[in-house]
Amino acid sequence: MEIFNTVASLKNFVAHARAEGKTIGLVPTMGALHRGHISLIHRAVAECDICVASVFVNPTQFNDKRDLECYPRTPEADAAVLAEAACHAVFMPSVEEVYPEPDTRVFDLGSVAEVMEGKHRPGHFNGVAQVVSKLFMMVEPDKAYFGEKDFQQIAVIRSMVNLLGLPVTIVACPIIREEDGLALSSRNVRLGTEERAIAPSIARILGQSRTLRPAHTPEAVTRWVTESLNALPHLQVEYFEIVDGNSLQKIDNWQDTDHAVGCITVYCGEVRLIDNIKYED
C-alpha cells in the first residue's frame, strides 16, 4: 500500500492508474478506523480496480472546537488496518496541504442540509462539502463510499455532486454495529464504562419503535423514542425526527412516503452519538 502526504503525489498515482484504464474507488475517512470503515474499504476493493482511502480530520466541518481537539487520531494504526484490508493507497495530508489558504466557498446544498444536523451544527455540512469536493477533484473517483450511519451526510454529498456536476457515483453502505447493537463510531472510544453499557439502548429503542408504526403516528413514535431514551441514565436526546428518506423533510403520516427514516442524535455523557432506522415495510 502506498501512503501519500501531498496532493501532487496523490494526483500522480491517480493519473498513472487512469492511464492504465483502471477504475478508482474513494473512501473518505477522518481516521480512528473501525470495522465500519473497513466494510467500506472491502466494498471499494471488490467493485473497483484501485481503492484510495483518505485519513484527514477536517477542521472546517467542526463547529465545536473542543470536539475537534478531542477527535481521536491514530494514523499509524489506521495505515496498518488499511494495508491489511488490501487498500491500494491512502492519502494522509496535513491541514496546510488540503487548505493552503482558507476555503471561502459556500455551497447551496438545499433543504437536505438545513434540517437535523444542519440545524444543530451550523456550518457543518458546508465544511463537509468543502473537503469532499476537494478530495473528489484530487482523486476523480468513479465511485465514493460512505456509511449510512451518517444518513443525512450522504444526502448532502449527493446534493453537492449534482450541484457541481461531478461524474462520481455515491455508494451508500449499511451501518455496521457492535454485537450489542451500538452503531460503530470513532467517537465510541470516548465513552466511559457506564456510558458504553447504556449506549446500545439507542439502537434497542429505535428497533422497538418499529413495532409502534402500525397503530401510531410518526409524531407519537417520535415522542415515545425521545421520552424512552431521556428516561435512561447518561442519555439526552438532541433530536429525533422521522423524515422522508430522500427529501429529509419531516413526515406527518406514514403514507407521506414509502421511505421513512428515523434519524437521531443522542448525547451519551459528553459524547455525541448518531444513528438511524428505516421504517420501510
Swiss-Prot record:
Q: Which CDD domains match?
A: PanC
Q: Which UniProt keywords apply?
A: ATP-binding, Cytoplasm, Ligase, Nucleotide-binding, Pantothenate biosynthesis
Output this protein's name. Pantothenate synthetase
- Which residues are named in the active-site annotation? 37 (proton donor)
Q: Which residues bind (R)-pantoate?
A: 61, 153
Q: What organism is this sequence from?
A: Porphyromonas gingivalis (strain ATCC BAA-308 / W83)
| Pathway note | Cofactor biosynthesis; (R)-pantothenate biosynthesis; (R)-pantothenate from (R)-pantoate and beta-alanine: step 1/1
* Catalytic reaction annotation: (R)-pantoate + beta-alanine + ATP = (R)-pantothenate + AMP + diphosphate + H(+)
Q: Which PANTHER family match?
A: CYTIDYLATE KINASE/PANTOATE-BETA-ALANINE LIGASE, PANTOATE--BETA-ALANINE LIGASE
Q: How does it assemble?
A: Homodimer.
Single GO MF descriptor: ATP binding
Compartments annotated for it: namely: Cytoplasm
Binding site residues for beta-alanine: 61
Tell me, which GO biological process terms does this entry list? pantothenate biosynthetic process
